[in-house]
């Protein structure tokens, strides 16, 4: 599956044209541009690069390159970049698909010049070599770099420079990554090379080259504009010439002393400005006094940087814990005390609260599938474990404003590490996300409420770019890591208020939360003891993310733009996953877990995480023990940079060997950087400098850091913040006479906070892990609408956890207190649709995003906290954690633009039965469905802060509120009682857009019609329909009406019948008997989907978007049918002492192994966890297995094409290759490849197999980029055809849904003869089909564009099957997001896909 190389034109339009670039044009009209470096322009070595005069050969290279040797974990050369002796180049065409190329050309002609008549692309691989490659190894490198069926499209000379067109002017533009840091792409590419024995490769970066032909010579500014269009200025640059060196000529800066003893505070003020330390008045006073009067010496620049990061607002939350003075009156409680008061009043089931990296509540005793010998090759079996439910939430706002894609990547990655670094380590399960940005100003969109006069800051990305790139970054990171994203929210806002203030999210919100699990025995971190080892595990150090903690604590625009860039981190999801696998192996050891304590590296880098892990005992740390990927880094940079994918852990000395063994298996670096010494200090030494001094007969240099922990990390003096409340001017909502309901809906349904979120959900994996019981999409058409997200704890139990989000920031512009209460109310009215253990078990994360230190905002935040506390205590629920981001403002057009203050409530709770979840899609027809309205506002209909007000350029003056808190409690308990007895068929909360939007959305999702008949009770039409007062709409059966009403009355809850459901797809809205709307469901749904589809066109192929948009008008419930009845595996199989062994094989970046193991386990197999590392090391051989499975995921992060690196690691390691060849030939074995494994089997030639003529690379079928050019995740329909496949026996003739999630799933047949032979032999057993069950190539039914709907290929003997969809993620019915009510199945039971795995078991029995 590939997302990083999803070759959509829009992905090359994410640069910025707001900043002029210094570009140089040579006399030959080739534009390479300037390589901008961290400090000064890079001086490139201009010696001529070595030319390799070789051409791509169609023959396969020989396999005998690597003999399977393996290095130790502490060496891991792929992680440590060595200087390259030379840089060689290979070029490959094309860079992007033909359709994407045409789209890019069209955009260029529109934005740059219509004189441009053609555009051609290629990619350049810039390869750093430690020494020359021999011919045999060179052929291997070429195989890795080339497309297997197009070897002629790879060469050592540029293809673009050969092209000429008579009478046209040509210019070449090349863009690529900045050289100041190694990209994650290069890290994975080098890792692939190492796995194939190409140890000479030290770095491999990819650049993109564009050839423009124009009728007239392009002007300099036009070339600059094009360059800006096709690269990200924050992470990339334009190359002025062919790279001949990766050296940056950066000289590491020596440790400096800051003359505080001589110059006092002035010295700190100067370094504060120079380094962007974000010291405020109180900081400057405290640290001047600390060093002059207490420590009595000059601090080093490393110490000051250290203090700035670990004691920044971002890290220490001074504001939340500080003293507040409002309107001249000291407040008796801090914000932290106010929020914690809810937890102190209602702890109940809390096991971790207001400490650690996450919070947790008491879970259940469950049977978890886990390895018997974690950290080594072994079988998996179920064991009873006491698992608690865990939750964490945080934001990554500042980085996303500066560089949205990497900022969001690392936001997601940092939160993932917060999850797994809780207690002594914990399990990552699923994520939620949220985005708040300014006005999109999307070209061609209908958004008359957006103010076209607003100016946007040049140092920040535009709101539109942030929404697209940040969501791409977070999605791609989660997809590669293997964490499903199952819930979220989106909001845009930009308006000048009646007070004259402009409020807008120029500094955006990128919200990321995670729900996971933790073994109850691991909830408490161990305390450091003398002799314990301080260990860092994860990726190497790079010069990135310098000062992120301090920079994120400032209003955007206060800091230097280059410092802002330096503060943005870079993510490597594949490295993050390897890190998590090491942590998971440790925690699955149970009571033998070697991890005593764990903290993830985030804001402040080592500055923060190391001091956290050694506090209060202290340790001496050797900076040179840290694994670095850039040897030019200074002590300051190694200590302070926020390079990601790192944890600090404490282990006992005797655990060192087992930890090294686990790290070696997962190919992760491990470094012991110090030992707990009990001195209470953090002392940072430089052993290299000390050795040099010793050699020269000099005393060792003083430590770069030597600080008493208590004085910089312990109880430091509180800060005091003073505010006055501000009464902002308000104006009543004024809707012009003559505005109709349809006029209003045309606007409201297009507002991003209301409209479809399809553009966010189809690009993110929502099924990986197999533990997702409820994600965003619902109903027969899989519309993005779910209110609550639900996870399962295991594959064998029905217990789980649910989470839901509430946030109402626009209401806060009118009344911060009401906003807080509404956020709580929305979270609960979303959460209520999952059956939970009890309302009193609900806990929540509270995330505060305010410009808190600006006038009026601190007091508003304080008032909101008081209201939040009071409401939660009355409800019996509590906040148990959260984060704050308190510099939510940016400079623009001469003013400070504050973001609307936002409080995001993420409620989470335990579920006794995950199958009892109600979705919003209407299900009842034939006059049986009745709609009930449960009104929490008891008749009030206030429009202030509503979507209606926003789309008419106003906010109004009368704010909705939760006036009766106890009534919300009654409603929650009452609806829970209805769900327990299966009396509710559909339900949805009332939120953005009001009652009418809630009802419409339910109809959209169910593909039904509705008749709404409402009474105005003396208020206006718009108040009746669009007020966003809290409430619920329930669909119930007419036969259950009396029972429902009676049960609600038992909870003192009243409900009103407001309409009925119809099978006819027509929506009719009456108020006081007058019809105000009568329109087709599809027509209104098209309005609701319009904004999402426009955003989709900026992310995937426009023709695919149009096809889906038009097709949606005619969609109907899929016509699925089964040719068999699913059943659980026979107990005789499950109880056998000896079961057939199946090797579940994974490579670096694979992420589908556990759900695959669970599926085979459920079919009576003994699944084994086997890595390629195990096979290379000889720890296991394949001769003991009857089945092998190649799992899904992103092996090597899909670098160099999907599964290419995995295939290379097998093909070019002789001992491993021979094992696979022998296994393939054995007549009593079978193999299965899913997704990435499917792509691998094609590359290995296992399907359709040599007998069909597909063994040569040039004719072997491959799975290539989806036609849409993007990763796609959908629950799609497939039909099962007759075939020899042993795993699909007895399933022929069935049509059903299955999860599919990939970026490269389009079957491609270079040789038509192979395709014909394959079809004639019935070797394409699985086909994508439409709603009628017909095989199709139409998008999105066929999500990748495979010819003839081909979704799977098998071998002629049926033993080997490769398929792109994921049956292992839906082998249980609760994993299905929807299925026909006509199916005779139990939601708690097996799904039809289990039969696939049972068939394999039956076949083995018959052999």
UniProtKB/Swiss-Prot annotation:
It is an enzyme of class 6 (ligase). PROSITE patterns: GATASE_TYPE_1. Pathway: Purine metabolism; IMP biosynthesis via de novo pathway; 5-amino-1-(5-phospho-D-ribosyl)imidazole from N(2)-formyl-N(1)-(5-phospho-D-ribosyl)glycinamide: step 1/2. Disruption phenotype: Lethal to the male gametophyte. Its main location: plastid. SUPFAM superfamilies: Class I glutamine amidotransferase-like, FGAM synthase PurL, linker domain, PurM C-terminal domain-like, PurM N-terminal domain-like, PurS-like. It holds the Pfam family FGAR-AT_N. It catalyses: N(2)-formyl-N(1)-(5-phospho-beta-D-ribosyl)glycinamide + L-glutamine + ATP + H2O = 2-formamido-N(1)-(5-O-phospho-beta-D-ribosyl)acetamidine + L-glutamate + ADP + phosphate + H(+). Residues 1-53 form a transit peptide. The active site is at 1235 (nucleophile), 1366, 1368. Essential to the male gametophyte development. Phosphoribosylformylglycinamidine synthase involved in the purines biosynthetic pathway. Catalyzes the ATP-dependent conversion of formylglycinamide ribonucleotide (FGAR) and glutamine to yield formylglycinamidine ribonucleotide (FGAM) and glutamate. This is Probable phosphoribosylformylglycinamidine synthase, chloroplastic/mitochondrial. It comes from Arabidopsis thaliana (Mouse-ear cress).
